Regions:
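A short, aliphatic-rich beta-strand micro-motif
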Residues: 33-42, 46-48
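Signal-transducing coupling segments at domain and membrane junctions
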Residues: 10, 15-34, 192, 249
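Short beta-strand-to-loop transition segments that serve as allosteric relay/switch motifs
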Residues: 33, 49-59, 65, 154, ...
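Allosteric cytosolic regulatory segments
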Residues: 70-77
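Acidic/proline- and glycine-rich, intrinsically disordered low-complexity segments
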Residues: 1-12, 18, 239-242
């Protein structure tokens, strides 16, 4: 009966089932004299079957019986559908709550306050495109004059990217305190991530060590958008020394570079969600706009420079939705 109803989706009345040609060969239970079966339908979808057997006084089922049972089946189908929708809504609410908690945990992993480094003003911000994201930045104190400053971007967005980013943050924090140089730290982190990350995922990373006593920044760029170093009145320098994105090749020989920081110099590190932000005509914000904003705001503090960049991106995007996570870190020597 269920198979027939699934194929035909219409009422079935059998007042003598043993002689019905449609069910030749079926071994009916001896207690079944007659039956009336109607589908329970919701928007052309079969959600159940309502069947009654053996009308009293051994009389045959009628069209009126079928009409009445069809009404009952329709009401029952709606009850079943309402119960299903309620369960789906409850599951959706539970999932939303889990994502909200994940977002809270992720935000708690970001620095809560800017680092206090003598002679420097440092700030960062991360704005996910969804409730949770795959961008993150970190300030990791090493000693009184050394601070690790890093910004990472995991491929993808949403909850999967945020879970991988949590692993990246933990890995970098662990390796920072035990690695002698920036390149060694990135190389060790890459090896660990390669072992624990699926082949279709990767991470871009800008990792740097600020020495506030020597006023130098030693950095290693693992496939990340090249940050800007604004120094003097000339063209900004792009910080591109490093190597491949993380987790692609287990043993990659990363390189590092040391740059000197003079009073007033500004380092701007950003994720591709900044430069690839588009307006309604699909025109990207681009690198040049970052240069223009920073050039006009170099006298401001690090937070002011960040606000200027974010504001310019918002103005450029207009009504276009944010498609990717946006993260910026600014280091300014006073």
């Amino acid at each position: 009966l269920l198979g027939w109803m699934h194929l035909n989706k219409k009422p079935l009345m059998l007042n003598d089932p043993r002689t019905d040609e449609r069910f030749r060969g079926v071994q009916w239970d001896e207690s079944i004299r007659s039956l009336l079966c109607v589908p329970m339908m919701v928007k052309s979808t079969l959600v159940g079957v309502l069947t009654v057997y053996n009308k009293r006084e051994e009389v045959a089922f009628t069209d009126e019986d079928q009409r009445l049972l069809a009404i009952i089946a329709g009401q029952s189908a709606q009850i079943v559908e309402n119960a299903r929708l309620y369960e789906e809504e409850q599951a959706l609410q539970r999932m939303k709550e889990e994502v909200r908690l994940a977002a809270t945990i992720q935000m708690d992993l970001l620095p809560k306050t800017p680092p206090d480094v003598a002679g420097y003003d440092i700030a960062g911000v991360s704005i996910p495109a969804q409730l949770v994201g795959g961008d993150a930045y970190d300030f990791i104190p090493i000693d009184s004059t050394h601070l690790a400053v890093c910004l990472a971007d995991v491929s993808g967005k949403g909850l999967p990217a945020s879970l991988l980013m949590a692993n990246v943050q933990a890995t970098l924090r662990g390796q920072t305190l035990s690695s002698p140089t920036a390149a060694v730290c990135v190389q060790r982190a890459n090896k660990l991530l390669h072992q624990s990350t699926s082949p279709d995922k990767f991470v871009t990373l800008f990792y740097s060590l600020l020495d506030s006593s020597k006023h130098t920044l030693t950095y290693c760029n693992a496939g990340h958008d090249n940050p800007f170093l604004f120094s003097g009145s000339g063209m900004p320098k792009r910080l591109g020394t490093g190597g491949l994105v993380l987790s692609i090749m287990e043993d990659f020989p990363y390189e590092e570079e040391v740059v000197a920081l003079s009073p007033g110099d500004v380092v701007v590190v950003y994720s591709d969600g900044i430069t690839e932000a588009v307006d309604p005509a699909q025109t990207q914000f681009g690198d040049r706009n970052i240069e223009s904003v920073v050039a006009a705001r170099r006298t401001l503090d690090a937070a002011g420079i960040i606000d200027g960049i974010v504001g310019a991106v918002r103005e450029h995007a207009g009504s276009a939705p944010q498609a990717d996570d946006m993260t910026i870190v600014v280091i300014k020597r006073k």
